[in-house]
Design a protein with these regions (language model features):
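N-terminal secretory signal peptides and thylakoid transit peptides that target proteins
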Residues: 1-22
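C-terminal segment of N-terminal export signals and the immediately downstream linker at the start
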Residues: 5, 23-64
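Alpha-helical structural elements of signaling/regulatory helical domains
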Residues: 49, 67, 85-88
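Mature-region segments of soluble proteins
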Residues: 56, 74-178
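Short acidic alpha-helical/loop segments enriched in Asp/Glu that coordinate divalent cations
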Residues: 67-75
Length: 178
């Protein structure tokens, strides 16, 4: 048998093996877990229930379906860091989660979306809610994370590149060209 070139039989064998290999690899992708949903959060001051409630609370205040909980967990880790050094702050968070759970005498995490929203609405003016809301958008919050910037197409602060005057402010790609 000649090894020069590729005949019809060799082509069919090679392409069918490649197709079978692609099918196996493609089906394995459905089995592998989504890395955006695999996350771990370490807290030292806040207990697990309080921390998980705060993650879901941050998501409820600033919902983005395409963002995984890992981005919201970073906010809770920052809340925990502040709670380590400020006992009054830790008390506000723990009592706030307890008050949120007490609205319907059921853990807030177990409520349906409508009841969760109603419970949050009833607590909007409390220091607890305002603290969590402020931390969620503050200097260590959701929109300060470079990976979140990438998700929304934000290139980051312009001052690092000389500001908008020397860099140009019309270099965005999402506006239609006229």
């Amino acid at each position: 048998m000649s090894t020069k070139g590729m005949n019809r039989r060799r082509f069919l064998q090679t392409s069918s093996l490649a197709l079978a290999g692609a099918a196996v690899v493609g089906s394995m992708g459905a089995i592998l877990p989504d890395p955006t949903n695999a996350w771990a959060m370490s807290t030292t001051t806040l207990d697990a229930h309080t921390a998980l409630t705060l993650v879901k609370l941050c998501r409820a205040i600033y919902p983005h379906d395409a963002l995984g909980d890992t981005y919201y967990a970073k906010i809770v880790e920052e809340l925990d860091k502040k709670a380590q050094t400020d006992p009054d702050f830790a008390r506000v968070l723990q009592e706030g989660v307890a008050a949120l759970d007490a609205v319907y005498h059921v853990q807030w995490l177990d409520l349906s979306e409508g009841y969760k929203r109603h419970a949050l609405k009833s607590m909007e003016s409390t220091p607890f809610f305002q603290t969590v809301r402020g931390f969620s958008i503050g200097s260590t919050g959701l929109y300060s994370q470079p990976l979140v910037w990438r998700h929304f197409g934000y290139e980051g602060p312009s001052w690092r590149f000389g500001g908008y005057l020397t860099r140009g402010f019309d270099d965005i790609g999402w506006l239609p060209e006229d």
